[in-house]
UniProtKB/Swiss-Prot annotation:
Residues 24-147 form the NTR domain. The keyword Disulfide bond applies. Belongs to the protease inhibitor I35 (TIMP) family. PANTHER family: METALLOPROTEASE INHIBITOR, METALLOPROTEINASE INHIBITOR 1. It comes from the Eukaryota. This is Metalloproteinase inhibitor 1. It is found in: Secreted. It comes from Bos taurus (Bovine).
Length: 207
């Protein structure tokens, strides 16, 4: 049996080296979609380094919340959030915070699970100062007006068409190859009349 052990180890190593890489892939959402689909949306500073839990499946970041835009009813008696949780590995969509600036504020949109706020690399997490004034207005107030009736419908290839009058066709990725185009930075999908949603300028909402 002795000669078999090195051979078996070699085979296992070869299988491991030749196994296809499984990386996390996702399409970034429009900011309005991120707001509407999240349980909690806050502005916060990352004030602590990542801590891995005892199972090594999750890690958490200590944060200092400075503003809450969504989630008051979901959090109920625990309105203050001190930690956010994420998978410990990037291959399973774990979020890794790379900024070392602990005074920088971030917009964080995530999901609640067992009273804890969870995010992944697919979540909307962005430096507050990098967002347009229209986006900040959207998260502060306007996006919520479109959550019940309207849907941002991504279009990444031709042909694509609306499936409902309550859909707004999001073409940033198609036209610019980026999710940070004009519609993302300046528009919201809002009710125009009952049963009809259209892109509307967030600048007009700011007037």
């Amino acid at each position: 049996m002795a000669p078999f052990a090195p051979m078996a180890s070699g085979i296992l190593l070869l299988l491991w080296l030749t196994a296809p890489s499984r990386a996390c892939t996702c399409v970034p959402p429009h900011p309005q979609t991120a707001f509407c689909n999240s349980d909690v949306v806050i502005r916060a500073k990352f004030v602590g380094t990542a801590e891995v839990n005892e199972t090594a499946l999750y890690q958490r970041y200590e944060i200092k919340m400075t503003k809450m835009f969504k989630g008051f009813s979901a959090l109920r008696d625990a309105p203050d959030i001190r930690f956010i949780y994420t998978p410990a590995m990037e291959s399973v969509c774990g979020y890794f915070h790379r900024s070392q600036n602990r005074s920088e504020e971030f917009l964080i949109a995530g999901q609640l699970s067992n009273g804890h706020l969870h995010i992944t690399t697919c979540s909307f997490v962005a430096p507050w100062n990098s967002m347009s004034s229209a986006q900040r207005r959207g998260f502060t107030k306007t996006y919520a007006a479109g959550c019940e009736e309207c849907t941002v419908f991504p279009c990444s290839s031709i042909p694509c068409k609306l499936q409902s009058d309550t859909h707004c066709l999001w073409t940033d990725q198609l036209l610019t190859g980026s999710d940070k185009g004009f519609q993302s930075r300046h528009l919201a999908c809002l009710p125009r009349e009952p049963g009809l949603c259209t892109w509307q300028s967030l600048r007009a909402q700011m007037a």
